[in-house]
Amino acid sequence: MTGLELAEYRVNEIRLGRETCYSSGLLEVDAEGLAALAAQDPRVSSASFDVVRPGEKARVTGIRDVVEPRVKTAGSGQVFPGVLGPVAPVGQGRTHRLSGMALVTAVAYEGTVRAGTTSQRSAILDMWGPGADMTPFSSLNNLVMTLDLEDGLSAYEAHQAIQRAEFSVALRLAETTTELAPDAVEIHDPDAAGDDLPRAVVIIGVFTEPDNRPSNVAYYGFPVQESLSTVIHPNELTDGAITPSTIRTVSYHPITWNWQHQPLVLGLLRDKRYRFAGVILERIGFETSREKEIAAHNAVRVAMSLGADAALITRTGSGNAFIEVMLTVKGCEEKGIKTVLVTYEYGGKDGADAPLLYYEKEADAVISTGNRDVVVELPAADRVVGAYDQLQLIGYPGAPYVAAGDPLTMEARDVIAGGIDIWGGRDRLCRPY
């Protein structure tokens, strides 16, 4: 695979107008035309659009996904292969991106699973105040697309409808740049690095549940379930070869924007001290100790086959799936592969509880990306957009509702879109203590 040129077009303002076009930082949006595009899927009844800006006292509800618009202008395939079009290799050629903005998709979908590890939940986003400080999405100019779906859809049908609608609209937005000169171009070509450099890999533990569709992670539109480790080229993430579920939007499960901007992958792509040997997707969340040991052993063997001297190891999800991650750290270290583990921690409401649920002594280089469990107090909003006028702050049947614009008390950061920095993409400073 050859290199990928990533051309940047900065969006400083979004305006609803008569046509969809981009010029000198202004993105004009034809809401009626984009609504018709989203509704080409018969499972989508209608779509509407709003704009929210950084610092505005606006709250977005019912968020199912966040996407940075991108389009391929050279090379094989198109962005989001296997979802928008046929499966074709991506990660080379040229891709345009609209930076400084995102398409935020909100949907009032109530799935059949309302509690437990497979609960189907949406997220919220505050564009100001303490909630905004927890998420990168509050600093973006956001185009909010609210979808109405046909009644009676299964979780997988709803996911397909949401994803196809949002990716189609995101692609249309990015297509406004195809004939324009970019503000900047970044080239990602890990294969051009010298063979004499140390070889590094990124291992991402991806949490999935057996027999549960949509899976939390899909590769070229194919759900990753019950699999052992898969090697992918780092540039494939840039072009949307990895996509998430839109049904379970809690912050420890990354959404599309997170995969497009995976910070450990981007860091190694830009670091000329290493040869980036590949990204390993390690399926985690197995149910027995034996299965967990096999998954970790397999990930270590794959890293060895790539000639890895070093590994950045991180994860998605929560719960006992962390056992596979820690066993992978242990296995890599035992085979001479130097590791750094990047993970959020639990810590309890005051940060004094055990931060991780499982340890191995080989994990002697760990970066914390913050405490998931802190209580969040959100002030009242002047404006509410998105799918819900009322919110269930605790995701179980019978939980009380509150007005979406009222002051809110959240028991953790989970329900804030981007509220948990699972991979260390923020500019927070960690100190040892």
Which residues fall in each region the model found?
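Glycine-rich, charge-decorated loop segments at or immediately adjacent to ligand/cofactor-binding or catalytic sites
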Residues: 346-364
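Small-residue-enriched flexible segments
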Residues: 190-286, 397-433
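Gly/Ser/Thr-rich loops at beta-strand to alpha-helix junctions
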Residues: 208, 314-324, 345-348
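A short helix->loop->beta-strand "cap" motif at the edges of active sites that frequently abuts
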Residues: 334-342
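Proline-aspartate-enriched helix->loop->beta-strand connector
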Residues: 307-312
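Extended, charge-rich low-complexity interaction segments
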Residues: 366-400
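A general structural motif
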Residues: 287-300
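Long, compositionally biased, glycine/small-hydrophobic-enriched stretches that function as flexible linkers
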Residues: 1-223, 403, 407-408, 425-433
